[in-house]
Amino acid sequence: MNISQAGINLIKSFEGLRTKAYKAVPTEKYYTIGYGHYGSDVHPCQVISEEKAEKLLRDDVQEFVDGVDKLLKVDVTQSQFDALVSFAYNVGLGALKSSTLLQYLNAGNFQKAANEFLKWNKSGGKVYNGLVKRREQERTLFLTGESKNVSRETSKPKTSKTNTHVVKKGDTLSEIAKKIKTSTKTLLELNPTIKNPNKIYVGQRINVGGSPVKSTLKYKIKRGETLTGIAKKNKTTVSQLMKLNPNIKNANNIYAGQTIRLK
């Protein structure tokens, strides 16, 4: 099986889009762009379209499509397959492989399998609202074939006129702040990815209201890497990485292509 547009749209709705290449951590070897695509094919100052970003996402997701397909021992619907791929892309194929969710599913107990989605709402032992929402939507898609706010058509990220501002040619952060009657400092707090107020770019989406955006940094493990090496490169500890990635039960049992959280 392959993932449908509805499945891709579900993943897109939670991953977030960045059309300009960036380094979330200065020590990273490569840049990231689009819906979290990272690698040697991403170059400094590179800008891509939303269509290209989706193409890169589909390429990245294919590994999880193939992985889920191999793990299944029962027939599933397209919507159920989409939900499982979204789940695996978020928590890792290793986590899905060892999960009770997969055990119930392969035993033919679809209802119990669906209920297992909701248990995967923590990171580092703490419940996160974003994970709660993602698991709820995956479960709903799995059971009913419909996921709230996710279309089956090719879609572009939704923007809110009251909460975001798309940078236009000639815009400065101070002018945007003045226009919406706030301060540059507040905008910087709401947009932690903006490190330099003088370096914003046309097309960039800036959060102008609500709570500060919590930065979630993901990293895709490459062949030959160890958790110790990744921790050292990103100036953290193995213990902290394991807290952020509760699906990693053994620090020595990670694999190339696995996506983990760094913060």
UniProtKB/Swiss-Prot annotation:
It is found in: Host cytoplasm. The active site is at E15 (proton donor/acceptor). Coiled coil: none annotated. It catalyses: Hydrolysis of (1->4)-beta-linkages between N-acetylmuramic acid and N-acetyl-D-glucosamine residues in a peptidoglycan and between N-acetyl-D-glucosamine residues in chitodextrins. Its EC number is 3.2.1.17. It comes from the Viruses. GO terms for molecular function: lysozyme activity. Pfam families: LysM, Phage_lysozyme. It is an enzyme of class 3 (hydrolase). The keyword Magnesium does not apply. Keywords: Antimicrobial, Bacteriolytic enzyme, Cytolysis, Glycosidase, Host cell lysis by virus, Host cytoplasm, Hydrolase, Viral release from host cell. GO terms for biological process: cell wall macromolecule catabolic process; defense response to bacterium; peptidoglycan catabolic process; viral release from host cell by cytolysis. Gene3D superfamilies: 1.10.530.40, LysM domain (3.10.350.10). Its main location: host cell. CDD domains: LysM, lyz_endolysin_autolysin. GO terms for cellular component: host cell cytoplasm. Endolysin with lysozyme activity that degrades host peptidoglycans and participates with the holin and spanin proteins in the sequential events which lead to the programmed host cell lysis releasing the mature viral particles. Once the holin has permeabilized the host cell membrane, the endolysin can reach the periplasm and break down the peptidoglycan layer. LysM domains are thought to be involved in peptidoglycan binding. Belongs to the glycosyl hydrolase 24 family. This is Endolysin. It comes from Bacillus phage B103 (Bacteriophage B103).
